[in-house]
UniProtKB/Swiss-Prot annotation:
Main function: Plays a critical role in recombination and DNA repair. Helps process Holliday junction intermediates to mature products by catalyzing branch migration. Has replication fork regression activity, unwinds stalled or blocked replication forks to make a HJ that can be resolved. Has a DNA unwinding activity characteristic of a DNA helicase with 3'-5' polarity. Plays a role in recovery after DNA ADP-ribosylation.
Species whose genome carries this gene: Escherichia coli O127:H6 (strain E2348/69 / EPEC)
Name by which UniProt lists this protein: ATP-dependent DNA helicase RecG
Subunit annotation: Monomer.
Region feature Wedge domain, mapped onto this chain: 48-146
This protein's record includes keyword DNA-binding: yes
GO molecular function: ATP binding; ATP hydrolysis activity; DNA binding; DNA helicase activity
Matching PROSITE patterns: HELICASE_ATP_BIND_1, HELICASE_CTER
Amino acid sequence: MKGRLLDAVPLSSLTGVGAALSNKLAKINLHTVQDLLLHLPLRYEDRTHLYPIGELLPGVYATVEGEVLNCNISFGSRRMMTCQISDGSGILTMRFFNFNAAMKNSLATGRRVLAYGEAKRGKYGAEMIHPEYRVQGDLSTPELQETLTPVYPTTEGVKQATLRKLTDQALDLLDTCAIEELLPPELSQGMMTLPEALRTLHRPPPTLQLSDLETGQHPAQRRLILEELLAHNLSMLALRAGAQRFHAQPLSANDALKNKLLAALPFKPTGAQARVVAEIERDMALDVPMMRLVQGDVGSGKTLVAALAALRAVAHGKQVALMAPTELLAEQHANNFRNWFAPLGIEVGWLAGKQKGKARLAQQEAIASGQVQMIVGTHAIFQEQVQFNGLALVIIDEQHRFGVHQRLALWEKGQQQGFHPHQLIMTATPIPRTLAMTAYADLDTSVIDELPPGRTPVTTVAIPDTRRIDIIDRVRHACMTEGRQAYWVCTLIEESELLEAQAAEATWEELKLALPELNVGLVHGRMKPAEKQAVMTSFKQGELHLLVATTVIEVGVDVPNASLMIIENPERLGLAQLHQLRGRVGRGAVASHCVLLYKTPLSKTAQIRLQVLRDSNDGFVIAQKDLEIRGPGELLGTRQTGNAEFKVADLLRDQAMIPEVQRLARHIHERYPQQAKALIERWMPETERYSNA
């Protein structure tokens, strides 16, 4: 193996890696030894010295050593094994809920045990629940760790101990195999070498300050952060350069349909809408594909902007596809577009994952023949069996739910006769500038920074759950006396559609009992699309007074008569999501209210979050605060997409570096194309195939 580059050495060449483990590691994108070395610890534990048991404080993670005094199994509400150890300074109780006979036998009275875990204050003094422990041999001195212990991001079935053993082998290979130095010499001068940085971060010596690692300031981290941010920026430059090599259908001015639609509208577009439409039309007139992100706050009128862009393509006899993240939102878009386009003689088609059989086949045929000019749906519209007929524009609503890879896959799908479609991406989640510079560097950006006239700002209050009855009375008053409608949103911390649906059903039953004079509807993610649509339609038509819902109504639902929103457990959601939910009210001229019904006690972070919402209705201000409180991954929807997910860099912490990184990335892109390509391959392997398009 000597002399090989580590990106060419598969993990299967390491001891202990068989087919089953290989498959599990592949789930976290670990395929080669280089991947493993770049899979860096999330945090570190200090197991390099012993704590006297008598000095343990609650909440401290510590290593202790003691002699087993007793070990007992009890059978109460659940089986439990407790083992007490003493080091002379105090007694520690170790508690285990998952255990076996071998564990019980190993913890015999008189044995010496080394244990690591979080100290808690228990009924009988200090205790640890499920500590990691090791029975000591006859050595008089305990075998302590020589370096800080790394804790890695992992996946089901891969233990920390496994990752540590594999990383030990990978670090040994650094002596015989090379990990290629990709930074040009003028950039890497005076910096730690890559092998040095990797050794330091995987096995930090006990002398190293943990605070440096926690703040991302250690030279080893700075070395890798620079490389990763460069790779990210280089991939965006490659995407842009790639896009410039593609051909798109140039769609010149042809305004007859647009003018007809504008004349039929009961309102005039805002100045911001008109400006953004002009920017889009300028892009679409070129023979390279448009790649434009339109940011607009909740209720700023992005749908009309999308419709006007679509008409430019339809006027040239081309097709337009609009993709939304949920069936509910896609269906609402389809209804909106039908209302606007039917009088113009334009047929709007609708495709969703749940469509089956003949209906789906008929829709696919209508798309393939070109009979349907505007296609609306979820990601189902980009499945293999859907064939377009001259697709010239792709509109993606709510970008964060898709991510860069899906965005690029759409391009490939849309390519026909050598032409790529223009792309328009719309998001109602305003993105702070630093974040947009990195995460969306491949896109041009337009901002709709003006709300339509006649919108009244929503008043937001935070009220503890103990006053639930008062809030129910407030709902009764709004619906019966004021003739308004209301939303009651249930949120759950677990990302489980089933549990969320059950919580919503329980709340629905409770509110039907408490408010017998109201018609109360229910909508959640586990209902069939047709059922959801039926409930939403009756709410929109005013047949229901109150709608109990999960966060499925977060985006796009438009009922101007709804003026009151209750959000339960708002402390469980991020600011951007709360702002989205709140945006479902305040869509008419009447004063609207949002009640954040929280459970006490509130954490400090939750207090700050709710205060931000009470103070501001501006999505951009809220997004900046959200970034400061939560960090970029959550803000960009990393949970769903993997977009903007960094191994060492942190866009919030490292934002000061971004302008300089962009300058360096341009330098490498122009002067060192081979290194640029290799850096992207190293840090962002999934993006590589698009960069070469």
